[in-house]
UniProtKB/Swiss-Prot annotation:
The keyword Nucleus applies. This is Proteasome activator 28. GO terms for molecular function: endopeptidase activator activity. Keywords: Nucleus, Proteasome. PANTHER family: LD45860P, PROTEASOME REGULATOR PA28. It comes from the Eukaryota. Homoheptamer. The homoheptamer associates with the 20S proteasome. It is found in: Nucleus. The gene is psmE3. One of its GO terms (cellular component) is cytoplasm. It comes from Dictyostelium discoideum. Gene3D superfamilies: Proteasome activator pa28, C-terminal domain (1.20.120.180).
Length: 225
């Protein structure tokens, strides 16, 4: 083969098909999935803050009425039980974090495959693509870390319960346990707000720059709407 001849490799049809599938899923997420999630988590954050009367918040409110004195008077067999509402809410957050990671990984995958070949000249659209990929990657890392650290509450509570069982006369451990549980309920409210906020800010960034993400070099780009 002559040194002047270069090998031409065309994009495989399966890869193009996969890219098109990611594009369709991306548009669906931007038009349906993400706006729905923003509204859902906004409402959940509000209901936790206002102690609304729905079933979940009714249970939560009931549990939150237990102040530090209740923990001091509570029988040991009840004290060592993990709060059922907290356990159930942890499972809901785990599901929510996984859904967020999956949703934005699809969008990140499509943007990555849609980056054009490297050329001299105007690469502003490509820079936008790379910046948004970076933002999405950071968001995924945040929620991956939250998944990994979700057991920290249970570990802290278990440690305090062990101390309570060993030192039944020291009320300070019971007060500490009350604070750990109350702190977890408070964190839930902020966590729902953070989910809504992170969905909204990332969604806004993507939609505002969608023309450059879809067609990074030509100026006659289309819009998802």
């Amino acid at each position: 083969m002559s040194k002047n001849n270069s090998t031409v490799i065309k994009m495989d049809e399966q890869v193009l098909k996969y890219k098109e599938d990611l594009y369709e899923k991306t548009v669906h997420h931007l038009k349906v999935t993400i706006p729905k999630k923003i509204a859902e988590y906004q409402e959940l954050a509000k209901s936790y803050g206002q102690n609304s009367e729905n079933e979940q918040d009714g249970q939560t409110s009931k549990k939150r009425k237990l102040d530090s004195e209740d923990y001091v008077l509570m029988p040991i067999e009840d004290l060592i039980k993990t709060n059922r509402v907290i356990m159930e809410t942890h499972q809901k957050f785990k599901k929510a974090y996984i859904e967020l990671i999956e949703t934005f990984s699809v969008i990140r995958g499509w943007i990555s495959l849609n980056i054009p070949r490297i050329e001299d000249g105007n690469n502003f659209g490509v820079d936008v693509q790379e910046d948004i990929i970076t933002q999405i990657t950071k968001l995924e890392e945040v929620y991956t870390s939250l998944l990994d650290g979700s057991e920290s509450y249970f570990a802290s509570r278990a440690s305090l319960v062990k101390k309570i069982l060993k030192h039944k006369d020291i009320e300070a451990y019971r007060y500490s346990l009350a604070q750990v549980d109350e702190k977890e309920f408070t964190r839930f409210s902020f966590s729902y707000f953070d989910l809504a906020n992170n969905y909204a800010t990332t969604y806004s960034l993507i939609v505002k720059n969608f023309a450059k993400l879809e067609t990074p070099r030509p100026t006659n780009a289309s819009n998802i709407y």
